[in-house]
Amino acid sequence: MKGGTMVENAQYLDASASAPGSTTPLETAWIRVREKLKSEVGEVEYRTWLRQIVLGPLEEDELTLYLPTRFLRDWVRSQYEERLQTLWRTEREDIKGVELQVKRGLPEVSMGDAEDGEDGSGEGHELATQAAAPESRSDLAVPLDPRFTFDTFIVGKPNEFAYACARRVAEKPSSPGFNPLFLYGGVGLGKTHLMHAIGTELTRTGKVSVAYMSAEKFMYRFIAAIRSQSTMEFKEQLRSVDVLMIDDLQFLIGKDNTQEEFFHTFNALVDAGRQIIVSADKSPSDLSGLEDRLRTRLGCGMVADIHATTFELRISILEAKAKASGTHVPSKVLEYLAHKITTNVRELEGALNRLIAHADLVGRPVTLDTTQDVLKDMLKAHDRRVTIEEIQRKVSEHWNIRLTDMSSARRARAVARPRQVAMYLAKQLTSRSLPEIGRKFGNRDHTTVMHAVNRVTELMDQDTSFAEDVELLRRMLEG
Ligand SMILES: Nc1ncnc2c1ncn2[C@@H]1O[C@H](COP(=O)(O)OP(=O)(O)OP(=O)(O)O)[C@@H](O)[C@H]1O
């Protein structure tokens, strides 16, 4: 658990229900954050996923937000965490990070997808299948995002091959040479979008049952099944679908039992002529840490890479999204965004949504001036974006240790101290949350990261030469 003093404490708060005059400053900020989120994502999405968030305590510079189940927490984390972090930091300078946690017994807003599983762990929906016809939906319901269709996917040079493969699988699942379909590429480039598009297309025809889940949820669900002694049921459910899609497979690295289970499921499905679709951040051959036999099988079908976006593709995506929003965004602004935000489509989309939401709220058109003003913090962060990988590399070079020791289990001080410094710098220089940082350091827990941050702060106070080292690294990284 976190240390430190509790500065502000707040409880459940509905943006529409509380009068600002009767709330604490933190609650008032929360109302504004929620309103912004609502206007960015729309009423339906807000009600489905975000309304359940409950304001928790602010301890030192870390704010906790609660969700009633692990399923919801994971979903909100994967889809909205970055946005929540940015909105909070814009709202309150004293908040440096936002942590999403599960808290049982919160007032849960009724919603089909958010009930607890049979073991009360909130994991019952982490395996989700969507049968073709609504009446034949099993007790497992899927969050296939209706916005992620082939129609809304913009095709350009970097993604045309992956798009064509996805289309082909949606038209003719289990075709020879296309099973499994392995989609890979960097963060936020459209892998999940394509998987959902395949799922939506297939279920539309009415004859195919599709199961989609992240590898992380596959693992949680598998562990929950072991705990509740229902692994047979879990296996049967999985093996009864026509199409199984697993997103972000890299999460299974280092999870040997779960990999084993996935391998058997994979074989059973492919042998029965069912389709498997997998996404990951690297190609099968580069996914070191996955069992060889699984890697080999994953590479046996069609492997399609989604490359980083080009300027032309970014412009086409922005044009399409601006058009769909119904708000006029001048082409100068679109070009400006496409030049400035080159990392991934998720960020590009987030920036555009923010501009449009701002224009709607203040009732003024989008201009280059308002763009620079509204996106000030985002663009600034872009100018000096530092990645955790860069931090790990620089710190390892500085102390002359192996890069792999950043994620290894070695505890020798010569390795552990630089690792702690890298965690500290990751917290200071990136917007990543503690659990995200932990994951990048060999799947360590967020409390380990918290401890590292505190320890390095303490040491910097006590030892000036250590403090100089850390400051030097920080300056080099900030460029
Ligand atoms: N070519 C595209 N056309 C339209 N929208 C896109 C395109 N590529 C990505 N997007 C949008 O960008 C956002 C991020 O995409 P998505 O979640 O599919 O990325 P991802 O590759 O799965 O990322 P991650 O590695 O984080 O899982 C989504 O809102 C998606 O709709």
From Swiss-Prot:
Q: Which SMART domains match?
A: AAA, Bac_DnaA_C
Annotated segments matching region Disordered: 106-137
Q: Name one GO cellular component term.
A: cytoplasm
Localization, UniProt: Cytoplasm
Region of interest: Domain II = 94-142
Question: What InterPro entries has UniProt attached to this entry?
Answer: AAA+_ATPase (IPR003593), Chromosome_initiator_DnaA (IPR001957), Chromosome_initiator_DnaA-like (IPR020591), Chromosome_initiator_DnaA_CS (IPR018312), DnaA_C (IPR013159), DnaA_dom (IPR013317), DnaA_N_dom (IPR024633), DnaA_N_sf (IPR038454)
Q: Looking at the keywords, is Cell cycle present?
A: no
- Residue numbers spanned by region Domain III, AAA+ region: 143-359
Q: Where is this region: Domain IV, binds dsDNA?
A: 360-479
Ordered alphabetically, the record's keywords are: ATP-binding, Cytoplasm, DNA replication, DNA-binding, Lipid-binding, Nucleotide-binding
One MF term from GO for this chain? Answer: ATP binding
Ranges for the region named Domain I, interacts with DnaA modulators are 1-94
What is one process in the GO biological process aspect for this record?
regulation of DNA replication
Where is it predominantly found?
A: cytoplasm
Q: Where does ATP bind?
A: G188, G190, K191, T192
| PANTHER family per the UniProt record, alphabetical | CHROMOSOMAL REPLICATION INITIATOR PROTEIN DNAA (PTHR30050:SF2)
Its job: Plays an essential role in the initiation and regulation of chromosomal replication. ATP-DnaA binds to the origin of replication (oriC) to initiate formation of the DNA replication initiation complex once per cell cycle. Binds the DnaA box (a 9 base pair repeat at the origin) and separates the double-stranded (ds)DNA. Forms a right-handed helical filament on oriC DNA; dsDNA binds to the exterior of the filament while single-stranded (ss)DNA is stabiized in the filament's interior.
Domain comment?
Domain I is involved in oligomerization and binding regulators, domain II is flexibile and of varying length in different bacteria, domain III forms the AAA+ region, while domain IV binds dsDNA.
Tell me, how does this one assemble?
A: Oligomerizes as a right-handed, spiral filament on DNA at oriC.
Family the entry assigns: Belongs to the DnaA family.
Q: What is this protein called?
A: Chromosomal replication initiator protein DnaA
